[in-house]
């Protein structure tokens, strides 16, 4: 597996979901929207994902699985794929990071890193 990423960029936006959260029970729900941009000249396919989620107490959760939201999307050259998913942590602040395993048009697997992004309720300092 190649660890270099051929022109794949990921943009992430996270959002606190107040109506599904229960702070009194240490339940904080967050949605995240990820856009994967294929800036290369060839088609790629997202095969699997791996996430490390850490709350502000240092509790960690690793999530791995095939595809994203039940799909293994094919992303054409100069196109993008956006999806929304979510996670629950026990603190009002956390961080999430990970990577995707993708396959290029020649069937060669490579890793696309997703830089750490913050999960936080609005207007909180930590």
Curated annotation (Swiss-Prot):
Residue ranges of every copy of the ApaG domain listed in the record: 2-126
Record-linked PROSITE patterns: APAG
PANTHER family reported in the protein's UniProt record: OS05G0170800 PROTEIN
Protein name per UniProt: Protein ApaG
Protein's organism: Vibrio atlanticus (strain LGP32)
Annotated SUPFAM superfamilies: ApaG-like (SSF110069)
InterPro entries according to UniProt: ApaG-like (IPR050718), ApaG_domain (IPR007474), ApaG_sf (IPR036767), Uncharacterised_ApaG (IPR023065)
Top-rank taxon, per record: Bacteria
Matches recorded under HAMAP family: ApaG
Cleavable signal peptide: none
């Amino acid at each position: 597996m190649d660890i270099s990423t051929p022109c794949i960029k990921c943009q992430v936006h996270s959002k606190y979901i107040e109506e599904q959260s229960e702070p009194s029970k240490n339940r904080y729900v967050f949605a995240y929207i990820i856009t994967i941009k294929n800036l290369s000249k060839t088609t790629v396919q997202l095969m699997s994902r791996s996430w490390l989620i850490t709350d502000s107490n240092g509790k960690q959760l690793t999530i791995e699985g095939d595809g994203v939201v039940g799909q293994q999307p094919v992303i054409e050259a100069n196109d993008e794929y956006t999806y929304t998913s979510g996670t629950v942590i026990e603190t009002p602040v956390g961080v999430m990071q990970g990577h995707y395993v993708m396959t290029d048009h020649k069937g060669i697997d490579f890793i696309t890193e997703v830089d750490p992004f913050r999960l936080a309720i609005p207007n909180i300092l930590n």
